[in-house]
A protein has these predicted regions:
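Active-site microenvironment for binding and transforming phosphate-containing groups
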Residues: 1-289
């Protein structure tokens, strides 16, 4: 199956994208896959998908990107803040050793050309970074845990140490993720944000009662009246944007996709909508040689 890619126009020297499920829900219906939580394009091997299909999808993606399939790099993410540099030495290692080095990694950086570094998401925030001055790229997976632990800082600092990247020159894209309105959480998640001082900005965190009214039927319903537990909404994309700005990345250099995975689950995988046994969006970037 030829992958459908949502491409980001950052610079002529890079290719940046997020994979999509399908053109629309009707095409999934026509293919008989509307109930298939892995349809129509998943390359993540850790979510229960058919191994043969995953491998086939990787090959198709490599073909579409015009790179070697072995140069599609995908870490096994664990909602932490480990950042791994993909250097030329890494590319020459046996696949078993590469897999070991990618275990528990949630962000990648490289300055190697024609290597696609990417992360998997299905509501969490994928973030792409490009340093044109030093010809270096990065990609990070920021779920709520990674956001609380500021994976943006860890990634930018790693780029600085490895490539002398100046945050003021970074170009950043924040890809599809669950929206402020749809990401409802309990007190445990709110408290984690509050302890880090991230709950004071109402643009990023607010109670369900404070959420602006919306006619969107895809927005999660406030259950606080049912279980007497307060409910909160968090804008993960906005939180990560503000963290990047605090590191010196200019606001005008940060592009938000504005795509809610929960509301657009027929085009982008959403674990909240489809369950965790479902496909994942692959958001990647390639430095063209």
């Amino acid at each position: 199956m030829i992958p459908k890619l949502h491409q980001y126009q950052i610079d002529n020297n890079v290719t940046a994208f997020s994979t999509m499920r399908s053109c629309d829900e009707n095409s999934l219906q026509a293919e008989g896959k509307v109930s298939d939580a892995y349809a129509s394009f998943n390359i993540n091997p850790w979510v229960g998908d058919n191994e043969e299909q995953v491998n086939s999808n990787r090959l198709e993606l490599a073909k579409a990107l015009e790179i070697n399939e072995k140069n599609i790099i995908l870490p096994h993410q664990t909602h932490q803040t480990e950042v791994r540099q993909i250097a030329s030495e890494f590319l020459s290692l046996p696949s078993s050793v590469q897999s070991m080095l990618l275990e528990g990694v949630d962000a990648l950086i490289t300055n190697e050309p024609n290597v696609c570094i990417g992360v998997s998401t299905a509501d969490c925030v994928p973030v792409i970074m490009y340093d044109a001055e030093h010809k270096a790229i990065a990609v990070a997976h920021a779920g709520w845990r990674g956001t609380v632990e500021n994976i943006m800082r860890k990634t930018v600092e790693k780029m600085y140490r490895s490539f002398n990247t100046d945050p003021k020159t970074l170009q950043v894209v924040i890809g599809p993720s669950i929206s402020f309105e749809s990401f409802e959480v309990g007190s445990d998640v709110f408290n984690a944000f509050n302890e880090k001082g991230l709950a004071t900005d109402k643009q990023c965190v607010c109670s369900s009662a404070q959420l602006p009214s919306t006619n969107n039927s895809n927005v999660l319903v406030d259950n606080s009246a049912k279980d007497n537990e307060p409910k909160w909404h968090i804008d993960l994309a906005q939180c990560n944007k503000k963290q990047l700005e605090s590191l010196g990345v200019p606001a005008q250099n940060i592009t938000l996709s504005g795509i809610c995975t929960y509301s657009n689950h027929h085009k982008y995988f959403s674990a909240r909508r489809l369950g965790t046994a479902s496909g994942r969006i692959y958001t990647g970037i390639i430095l063209r040689g």
